[in-house]
Amino acid sequence: EAEQALAEAGRQSTSRRQMEQHESFQEISPEVGILDEEAFADALRDDPDETLTLLAELVGATDEKLRELARSLAGRVVVDVVRTGAPRRRGIGRLRHRRADHGGELDVDRSLETIAASRARGDAPSLEDLTARDWSKPNLALCLLIDRSGSMGGERLATAAVAAAASLWRAPIDTSVIAFSDDAIVIASQGSGRDAEDVVNQIFRLRGHGTTDLAFAFRTAAAQLARSSATRKITLLLSDGRATAGDDPTIAATDLDELIVLAPADDAENAQSLADSVGGRCVMVSGPA
């Protein structure tokens, strides 16, 4: 169902003439069917926001060959952008070792000497002398909600892709990514550990659609995060915070442990009000990078 929705969303395309508004476009794609990766890398270094915005348009190019080249590049580029300033990884349970009588799976390598000694004596090893291993509880779970209602241009797509890659870098296993309007597309479900590049590529296929039902989005996030055993569960809302359909979002938000609204810096008033009303935080976003 999600794949079908993404396929339908991705049918809209961007012409070369539309992309010519970007100064670097002619150098990156000097002719039909060409994508110069070296020129792209230079442009990305000089102006990350502008170049990521262009990348979001390239993956939806009318030029089929250019589109395929951009799609082969997109996921890797966005993930690399995130990794260059990557925070300490969290959210993956840490492998820990303990006495086997405290539970867990037997660690044969660490217990081998004890087992051999017991066999030599002709008796069974005691659990307290054996070593087991298990995973400690992850301390962070994230759910990223991407508002895809209305217009979904290059800059919004690029910002959403970077936000998703950053979330998956922070909590690689325990992150869900959902695109919503008056319905929802679950791009990555909680605990799926879906590859970040795959998620980014799916996000780049999104196009604007429908009205903005924040309450529905919050309920969807709560259902995803309920699957997690993490000690801290954060919902990230990438939106201007302006609900145009559905129930009162402030009521639905009470089911969320923690809410952070990622709002466009030039249109954050509603997002700030929403965050304030539910005890959340609002962070201004001025560009993809």
Give residue ranges: language-model regions:
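A short glycine/serine-rich beta->alpha loop
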Residues: 96-97, 148-153, 206-210
